[in-house]
């Protein structure tokens, strides 16, 4: 699904090839600010988890975490981070197209800066994320808005890959959207998300009785 790159696996392997964790080892701020959404024992899916900073943090909160990424190099670093922190995460090497998506299995699906997907593949991905939720399960998502093209402090250079409130409302309006906000903040998430940033955050819950299959 990473149509922004000719060979996404090779691209991300190259980016993750240094010893440095390029997005840092601390969790994404939007995710950490919503820690109260999570209860120990909840089953959570981390989409395109990269080097593991977010999945490892969720495991530290007592969650049962499945996490995948297209990059074997990224997953190897994620496993190392989990071992260092003394937590268990079920990591697997998959892109979003070949991941074995299931229906109604997760209390939460977390998607942080997954803006490698073009509009068509993004629509499919969002549908799969919704279908993966249990009733009353929650999606937590963060991305960049078009204004990020001015800051150039992270994220894709493609306007079509960026999010607006209208885009996310259209994609997730069949959920109960409790938060959908565009804002600016200085990020210090490694070397790749660093500096003034134009952000958007979403929290949306699957209503009982809704069927996204």
Region locations from a protein language model:
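Conserved SAM/SAH-binding beta-strand->alpha-helix loop
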Residues: 71-73
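Conserved SAM-binding loop
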Residues: 78-79
């Amino acid at each position: 699904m990473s149509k922004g790159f000719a060979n996404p696996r090779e691209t991300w392997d190259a980016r993750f090839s240094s010893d440095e964790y390029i997005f840092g080892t601390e969790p994404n701020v939007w995710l950490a600010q919503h820690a109260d959404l999570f209860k120990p024992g909840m089953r959570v899916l981390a989409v395109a988890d990269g080097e593991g900073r977010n999945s490892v943090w969720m495991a530290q909160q007592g969650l049962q975490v499945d996490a995948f990424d297209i990059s074997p190099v990224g997953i190897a670093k994620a496993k190392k981070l989990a071992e260092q922190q003394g937590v268990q995460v079920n990591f697997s090497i998959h892109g979003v197209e070949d991941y074995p998506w299931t229906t109604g299995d997760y209390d939460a699906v977390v998607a942080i800066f997954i803006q490698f997907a073009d509009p068509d593949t993004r629509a499919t991905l969002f549908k799969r994320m919704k279908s993966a939720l249990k009733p009353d399960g929650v999606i937590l998502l963060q991305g960049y808005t078009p204004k990020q093209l001015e800051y150039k402090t992270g994220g894709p250079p493609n306007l079509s890959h960026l999010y607006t409130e209208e885009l996310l409302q259209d994609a997730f309006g069949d959920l109960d959207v409790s938060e959908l906000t565009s804002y600016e903040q200085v990020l210090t998430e490694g070397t790749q998300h660093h500096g003034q940033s134009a952000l958007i955050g979403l929290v949306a819950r699957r209503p009982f009785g809704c069927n996204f299959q």
